[in-house]
């Protein structure tokens, strides 16, 4: 599908649930957020229907997210069914890793193509401070289990919420020790993310070069998104940056998002989109559903404008509710 600005949109991120087994400080309050009822979230049959229609329109890659997608029963089974849809080329998963080790075999059987693990620190006490839960040991069990399968693409996503440079050095060191790509993701001012000091790509890169030596740009692409990568001598994996704030990549954006309650939207910043759940439960045909999906794509905003004055169209929900 091509939007009105000429961008090819072939990537759909699907939030399976707004629930999570962690309470990361930049994502939700310690007490959590009011969870949607089972009746409010899309059924797997509804998700599959959307995926089939989206594939017919040109969507080729699906990312399963949350909340934490692995807390919803049957995640691997859904992934397997999505993989079987004609036109779908890749199905990937973003997880906090807590439940990964115990569900990895089912995910591999489903044919999952890649797994991204969200991890912001290697320090158990800092992990507990950021996530407000224990669990670092479980995350590493998941990482080690995934590393036992060399054909599985594994990446670490790290939000620089802890400003101490030793933390950046430690996280990046995973790419030195293992064949893992470590990506630092600039905090976007959405939900609780607005409350934290901003750490930009250049400051993190300077810390890493001081610790590990020169970083050289790598032209290869690893995955579906806008990450740009660097190599470091002696590293088994690459270091990447997703820098939506300082290196705006909206002109190359290739995605739309589906929230767990069935709202499809074109940009993280804005509430603008369409309630696909309401259409389906109202009895729409597949042709009508496809037209609704196409309109979201066609009307995808030209860019985010987080530096501009707030508007009534700005998203008011947090990342766990939108889908990370």
What are these regions (language model features)?
Residues 32-37, 123-130, 190-195, 275-276:
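A short acidic, helix-capping loop that chelates divalent metal ions and anchors anionic groups
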Residues 18-20, 28-31, 119-121, 186, ...:
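Short, small-residue-rich loop/turn micro-motifs
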Residues 22, 124-125, 248, 274:
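Glycine-centered loop/turn positions within well-structured domains
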């Amino acid at each position: 599908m091509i939007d009105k600005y000429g961008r090819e949109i072939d990537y759909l991120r699907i939030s399976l649930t707004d629930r999570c087994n962690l309470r990361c400080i930049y994502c939700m309050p310690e007490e959590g957020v009011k969870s949607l009822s089972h009746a409010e979230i899309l059924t797997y049959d509804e998700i599959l229907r959307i995926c089939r229609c989206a594939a017919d329109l040109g969507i080729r890659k699906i990312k399963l997210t949350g909340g934490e997608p692995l807390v919803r029963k049957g995640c691997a089974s859904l992934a397997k069914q999505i993989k079987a849809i004609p036109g779908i080329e890749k199905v990937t998963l973003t997880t906090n890793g807590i439940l990964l080790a115990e569900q990895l075999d089912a995910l591999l059987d489903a044919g999952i193509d890649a797994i991204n693990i969200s991890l912001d620190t290697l320090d158990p006490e800092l992990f507990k401070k950021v996530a407000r839960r224990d669990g670092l040991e479980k995350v590493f069990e998941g990482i080690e289990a995934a590393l036992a399968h060399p054909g599985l693409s594994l990446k670490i996503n790290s939000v620089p919420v802890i400003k101490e440079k030793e933390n950046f050095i430690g996280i990046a060191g995973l790419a030195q020790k293992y064949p893992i790509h470590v990506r630092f993701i600039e905090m976007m001012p959405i939900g609780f993310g607005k409350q934290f000091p901003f750490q930009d790509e250049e400051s993190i890169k300077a810390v890493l070069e001081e610790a590990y030596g020169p970083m050289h740009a790598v032209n290869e692409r690893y995955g579906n998104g806008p990450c740009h990568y660097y190599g470091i001598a002696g590293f088994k994996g690459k270091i990447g940056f997703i820098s939506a704030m300082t290196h705006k990549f909206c002109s190359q954006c290739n995605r739309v998002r589906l929230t767990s309650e069935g709202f499809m939207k074109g940009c993280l910043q804005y509430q603008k989109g369409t309630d696909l759940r309401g259409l389906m439960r109202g009895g729409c045909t597949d042709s009508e559903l496809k037209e609704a999906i196409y309109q979201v794509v066609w009307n995808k905003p030209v860019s985010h404008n987080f530096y501009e004055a707030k508007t009534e169209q700005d998203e008011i929900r947090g990342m766990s509710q939108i889908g990370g």
